[in-house]
């Protein structure tokens, strides 16, 4: 038990944390259940196995690279049985030899000298490192120091201070920036030997002021005019081992300086392929990571239309066809030439840059690149030859961060939020560049604006700042001090809440979010041809600030776009709570912490919609509340009613001004107000729509269920009498019956179109539920009673099952401890679906709950509404 106790740490308010499994429990019973569970027992056994292996193992080095595990095994078997040998996969210069028992290991260590094939072996005991369980390892893209991050954020004074602290913890240190500068200088020195006059420009995260630990090093190799005579790449001398080489290699990795060929003659195609085969694993394992640049989209945009031909050639079909063939042939030649140069750059990286490995040319990308890894610095990077536009994208982002100090904290926070919710990354997800542009567009649409539009910046550019790249106007001031500061003084906490609220209701597919104009351009109405040339529309349309033919979110699928808006809606709902606005005096998570909790699996599950039965929406609302509160024992804190028609609102509607939740301080306008559409929501909302309402369930239950069966201020229980009354008030009618009836129109307009509940659970009421229900049914059968025949009887049975799972001291545990998890359940009348999204899930229980609700909710509503 002592070993188990050493893994457990006591937390405030009766909580416990298992450091071995990286799990936090709400109380002692939950801790005992965890310690007896399979996950904890398996990790305890794995730790014991690893410790025993370490005590039987030795570290061996000094043998040649051509020595294999079979030769080592044959040698060490002279001292005793050999259980396993692990070779160094990277360099092949060391091995871990696990002997069959401790006595064999002691025999190896007692030998004063070991030699194999004429080489002296260095043998020493294996270093005993602290066991790190797979559960405690951070998922890809998540900060490995999450606990330190959470502690630092919890100690901040307010949400704004949390956001500033997040920037300090995630940005590059000065030493990391200097290391990147050295790598760029090394690349510059090497490539200058082959391409005199070339310039290596860094762009992307390293220079756009949104850098994070471990971000890629994106480089643009500017070769100048390729048509000018270039020196013969076969004859130049190789760069000598300079101070840059020694700075990067000797201090970080003494074995990084490899022998380089005397000339590129030795870099034959065969040798290059062999080298690549040695450096690479599989192409799939080297999928490009999403950079913070225009390289982020893996999709290929539509090709530009051919230049217009003269009227004379239009009359000559043969001449036109010949012209097209000539252009196609010229384009093919240029592509082949660019590919050849790209391969040459890859060859130089492989053979002439110390410490570079895993070089891969990607000519098929939208912007062809050469990917590489630099062993001494641990950096991953890309080199592109035709991406000058990305330099100005990076400088534009840097200018935006200099214009207003709130830009960086907001971008860092939203990047971290999107990362933890599985919304950003590669493939169909948002890349960091697109997410950053989305934040800048949002800041352009505030009233007053936080940032100016790109068109306004172009007008304020000076004579020396007029730049055109690839036919696109990239003019903007270089010095932010020349620009007038924004008159917007809203705090960071308010801007973050507004972002979530606005994105949740923007029309992402029906409009084009333009940073140049600072407004949403409707897709249906058509745009000027110069804005549409080659633009590929999709479920999410976000225009590049300079290359107006590029949709930076073209790779985003409809599913990801819906999940983005759903997650923003859940986050906006949370930002209205006191838990977000005020620091907790009880030590519970507050402010940014619930938003930044790792929940990628949960967020993926929350995109799966739970279908609702065909019934009047008020009946469904009432039944859902009863299922959540009575059948499952959820503590329901609040509900949200979303947009509805103002003109059709009943005069007797209980939704008066007193029921509106006060707006956040400084949040004067949001996208729900419908005012100044270009400054707020991008969607084409009706003028009669009113702002979002937040109603406390205990204050206005009649508006939720449209029932008056219970006492005032209390949500009525789902009884047969209430169901009958609901059916009388809202009888089921065939689809289309009574269409256009004024009375029905008024009645339907008074109902909420979308309802949300914030729910909390203190017990895992979904685990063992089938077994508990089976026991109850057996007892009922033995007593001679039949099964439930009405919705009320079914509800009573499920409530009893829940109470049995919770235990006799459930109420005391609820008052003393924190909930296991909290989630938001949102019912939509238009889509007739229920969405469940996690808010707080420290133990990762939401996937199990969601799987249970997918089956339980439809069946429960069917039983209640039959």
Swiss-Prot record:
SUPFAM superfamilies: beta-beta-alpha zinc fingers (SSF57667), Nucleotidyltransferase (SSF81301), PAP/OAS1 substrate-binding domain (SSF81631), RNA-binding domain, RBD (SSF54928). Residues 599-866 are annotated as: KA1. GO terms for cellular component: cytosol; mRNA cleavage and polyadenylation specificity factor complex; nuclear speck; nucleolus; nucleoplasm. Keywords: ATP-binding, Magnesium, Manganese, Metal-binding, mRNA processing, Nucleotide-binding, Nucleotidyltransferase, Nucleus, Phosphoprotein, RNA-binding, Transferase, Zinc, Zinc-finger. Its main location: nucleus. GO terms for biological process: co-transcriptional mRNA 3'-end processing, cleavage and polyadenylation pathway; mRNA 3'-end processing; regulation of RNA metabolic process; RNA 3'-end processing; snRNA processing; U6 snRNA 3'-end processing. Pfam families: MTPAP-like_central, PAP_assoc, RRM_1, zf-met. ATP binds at residues 205, 393. It is found in: Nucleus, Nucleolus; Nucleus speckle. A zinc finger (Matrin-type) spans 16-46. One of its GO terms (molecular function) is enzyme binding. Residues 669-687 have a biased composition (Basic and acidic residues). Adenylyltransferase activity is specifically phosphatidylinositol 4,5-bisphosphate (PtdIns(4,5)P2). Residues 492-550 form the PAP-associated domain. UTP binds at residues 216, 218, 393, 415, 433, 550. Residues 56-128 form the RRM domain. SMART domains: RRM, ZnF_U1. Phosphorylated by CK1 in the proline-rich (Pro-rich) region. The modification Phosphoserine is found at residues 686, 741. The zinc-finger domain is required for terminal uridylyltransferase activity. Together with the RRM domain, binds the 5'-area of U6 snRNA. Associates with the cleavage and polyadenylation specificity factor (CPSF) complex. Interacts with CPSF1 and CPSF3; the interaction is direct. Interacts with PIP5K1A. PANTHER family: POLY A POLYMERASE CID PAP -RELATED, SPECKLE TARGETED PIP5K1A-REGULATED POLY(A) POLYMERASE. Belongs to the DNA polymerase type-B-like family. This is Speckle targeted PIP5K1A-regulated poly(A) polymerase. It comes from Rattus norvegicus.
């Amino acid at each position: 038990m002592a070993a188990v106790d050493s893994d457990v740490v006591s937390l405030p308010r009766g909580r416990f944390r298992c450091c071995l499994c990286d799990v936090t429990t709400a109380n002692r019973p939950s801790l005992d259940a965890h310690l007896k569970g399979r996950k904890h027992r398996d990790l305890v056994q794995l730790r014991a196995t690893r410790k025993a292996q370490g005590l039987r193992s030795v570290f061996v080095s000094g043998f040649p690279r051509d020595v294999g595990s079979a030769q080592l095994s044959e040698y060490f078997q002279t001292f005793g049985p050999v259980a396993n040998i692990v070779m160094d996969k990277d360099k092949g210069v060391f091995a871990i030899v696990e002997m069959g028992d401790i006595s064999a290991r002691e025999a190896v260590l007692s030998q004063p000298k070991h030699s194999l094939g004429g080489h002296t072996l260095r043998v020493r005991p294996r270093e005993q490192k602290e066991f790190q369980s797979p559960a405690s390892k951070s998922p890809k893209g998540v900060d490995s120091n999450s606990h330190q991050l959470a502690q630092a954020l919890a100690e901040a004074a307010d949400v704004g201070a949390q956001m500033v602290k997040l920037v300090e913890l995630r940005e590059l240190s000065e030493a990391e920036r200097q290391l990147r500068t050295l790598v760029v200088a090394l690349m510059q020195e090497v490539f200058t030997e082959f391409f005199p006059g070339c310039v290596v420009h860094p762009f992307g995260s390293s220079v756009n002021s949104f850098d994070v630990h471990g971000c890629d090093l994106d480089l643009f190799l500017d070769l100048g005019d390729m048509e000018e005579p270039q020196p013969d790449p076969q004859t130049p001398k190789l760069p000598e081992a300079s101070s840059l080489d020694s700075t990067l290699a000797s201090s970080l990795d003494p074995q990084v300086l490899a022998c380089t060929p005397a000339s590129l003659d030795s870099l034959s195609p065969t040798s290059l392929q062999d080298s690549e085969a040695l450096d690479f694993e599989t192409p799939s394992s080297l999928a490009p990571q999403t950079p913070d640049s225009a390289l982020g989209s893996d999709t290929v945009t539509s090709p530009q239309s051919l230049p217009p031909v003269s009227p004379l050639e239009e009359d000559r079909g043969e001449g036109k066809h010949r012209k097209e063939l000539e252009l196609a042939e010229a384009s093919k030649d240029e592509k082949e030439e660019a590919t050849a140069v790209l391969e040459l750059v890859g060859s130089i990286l492989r053979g002439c840059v110390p410490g570079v490995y895993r070089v891969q040319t990607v000519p098929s990308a939208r912007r062809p690149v050469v990917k590489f890894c630099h062993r001494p610095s641990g950096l991953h990077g890309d080199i592109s030859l035709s991406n000058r536009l990305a330099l100005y994208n990076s400088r534009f982002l840097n200018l935006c961060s200099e214009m207003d100090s709130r830009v960086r904290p907001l971008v860092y926070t939203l990047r971290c939020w999107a990362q933890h919710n599985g919304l950003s990354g590669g493939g169909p997800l948002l890349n960091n560049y697109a997410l950053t542009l989305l934040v800048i567009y949002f800041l352009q649409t505030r009233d007053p604006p936080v940032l100016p539009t790109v068109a306004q910046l172009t007008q304020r550019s000076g004579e020396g700042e007029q730049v055109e790249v690839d036919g696109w106007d990239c003019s903007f001031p270089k010095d932010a001090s020349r620009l007038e500061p924004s008159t917007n003084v809203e705090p960071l906490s308010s801007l973050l809440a507004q972002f979530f609220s606005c994105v949740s209701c923007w029309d992402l597919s029906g409009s084009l979010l333009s940073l140049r104009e600072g407004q949403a351009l409707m897709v249906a109405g058509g745009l000027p041809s110069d804005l549409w040339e080659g633009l590929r529309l999709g479920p999410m349309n976000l225009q590049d600030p300079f290359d107006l033919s590029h949709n930076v979110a073209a790779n985003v699928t409809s599913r990801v776009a819906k999940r983005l808006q759903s997650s923003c809606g859940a986050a906006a709902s949370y930002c209205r709570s006191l838990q977000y606005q005020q620091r907790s005096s009880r030590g519970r998570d507050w402010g940014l912490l619930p938003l930044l909790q790792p929940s990628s699996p949960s967020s993926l599950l929350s995109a799966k919609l739970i279908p609702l039965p065909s019934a009047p929406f008020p009946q469904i609302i009432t039944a859902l509340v009863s299922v959540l509160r009575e059948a499952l024992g959820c503590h329901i804190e609040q509900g949200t009613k979303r947009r509805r028609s103002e003109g059709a609102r009943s005069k007797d509607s209980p939704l008066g001004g007193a029921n509106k939740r006060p707006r956040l301080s400084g949040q004067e306008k949001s996208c729900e107000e419908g005012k100044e559409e270009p400054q707020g929501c991008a969607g084409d909302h009706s003028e009669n729509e009113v702002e979002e309402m937040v109603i406390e369930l205990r204050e206005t239950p009649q508006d939720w269920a449209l029932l008056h069966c219970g006492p005032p201020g209390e949500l009525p229980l789902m009884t047969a009498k209430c169901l009958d009354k609901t059916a009388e008030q809202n009888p089921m009618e065939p689809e289309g019956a009574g269409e256009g009836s004024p009375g029905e129109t008024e009645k339907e307009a008074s109902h909420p179109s979308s309802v949300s509940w914030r729910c909390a659970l203190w017990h895992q009421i979904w685990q063992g539920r089938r077994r508990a229900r089976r026991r109850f049914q057996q007892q009922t059968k033995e007593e001679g009673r039949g099964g439930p025949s009405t919705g009320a009887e079914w509800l009573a049975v499920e409530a009893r099952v829940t109470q049995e799972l919770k235990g006799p001291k459930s109420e005391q545990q609820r008052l003393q401890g924190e909930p296991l998890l909290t989630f938001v359940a949102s019912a939509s009348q238009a889509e007739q679906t229920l969405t469940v999204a996690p808010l707080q899930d420290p133990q990762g229980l939401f996937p199990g709950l969601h799987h249970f609700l997918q089956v339980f909710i439809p069946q429960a509503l069917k039983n209640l509404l039959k």
